[in-house]
């Protein structure tokens, strides 16, 4: 489900990703199934990561190492030989001490930095991956079954049953009063389409399936686009290019880089294809909570936004319109958002972990 800034509802995207360990894009499009282009995790070497930090932020290696009463996030600093705050069991000096020193300096220089309560430790990351495995499995299952003649109500039941059978809970169900286990957004619906028996998928439709899972208190979130039967070349191109826009955002991820560079890369790619990007909704942190910091804008400027720090987890999920970027949120159900001009729209969502060398896909 997407996250909205300056709107009354939150939310997230939906679609399908197949991870490849090779270079480039893999996958085939099925006439009545999902569009599976796939992509690699873009990585940087530790040396490159260090260079990025030194060049952009000019870290001072001689900073005093005494503990501080309050650091960049208002919390105290552990002693160097104390157990690290992340739960790793390691001594602070062997774990997050250097990260905290960097973040403190960046904060002092005026950069927006993540607070420690959104950075995930090793045990947290493994728990989020377990949740994500269910979320990916749900969407893989939908890819096998979705076809013309299927109602979105049926899809909702599939997703509820699969999630419960695998020990999870659908995060959408009851969230802010949302009545279903998944968001199903067809053609001109940007986000938060509510499944119902009346919405029956037809040949030529494009639909976004946005699925989120809770397992042992940890959250995962991703979505996929599906082409139903034979679709027009215009719709197929919109779906394909929107996914490539997400890939452009992933390629812009650099540890100790800036979040605005990611959103700007997405926006630049989409505009170059003749499309517009929705302004009001974006990605979000996800892991400890369904929606947590940071907000991920896809109309951001390069060189702005939060510093990307290893341990951050968030979604990349632009909503790309074939027409104008304006939205219509007047639906009486209080949730469903459409394009204001009735044009088609597409969205893909992935959940990523920032690592020391690049990123890792968690859910797709």
Question: Residues of each region from the PLM?
Answer:
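Acidic/negatively charged segments and metal-coordination signatures
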Residues: 2-12, 16-25, 29-118
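Active-site neighborhoods and metal-handling regions in enzymes and metal-associated proteins
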Residues: 3, 48, 79-80, 88-94, ...
